[in-house]
């Protein structure tokens, strides 16, 4: 495998690792190269991103590498955040939102155990839409972030309090929480 292909694969690995980032050891294992070689490639890629007219940079914090946006573009990102969007939430985001609404405060890991898949993207979407927020930290190893719904969540779905959420009766416990939640909300909106 040539250097260009290695960089392409590393770029993809950085992307899919998201905010958690990736260790050079992981890259070395995936590419079946020495760790020093992985670090050299990452450093080359950092320089290429800095020198080029690109919107992303590769940053390193505590031995972890990840993509980050450039500070000089921050005003444009803020405009995007401030721009109302008509885009609806994905099914994954809706399922995650229902889990948070009924089980809050809840950690990302607990959500992933319920859904059976990663929730990183859905969480980012829900936080950016101000429907959920960090509510604190759980006790225990790593002190994971606890998530809960926001006032904007209540406003968006026409709820005064969380007590207005459709109840989970025994017959509905087997039903998908997202389907139940949004089915009941459709009844409320009629």
UniProtKB/Swiss-Prot annotation:
Keyword Transmembrane helix listed? The answer is no
Q: Which domain of life is it from?
A: Bacteria
Location comes to: Cytoplasm
Could you tell me the Gene Ontology terms of the biological process aspect for this record?
A: cell division; chromosome separation; DNA replication
Which cysteines link up through disulfide bonds? none
> What function does the entry list?
Participates in chromosomal partition during cell division. May act via the formation of a condensin-like complex containing Smc and ScpA that pull DNA away from mid-cell into both cell halves.
- State the family it belongs to: Belongs to the ScpB family.
- Its recorded name reads Segregation and condensation protein B
Q: What is the lineage of its organism?
A: Bacteria, Bacillati, Bacillota, Bacilli, Bacillales
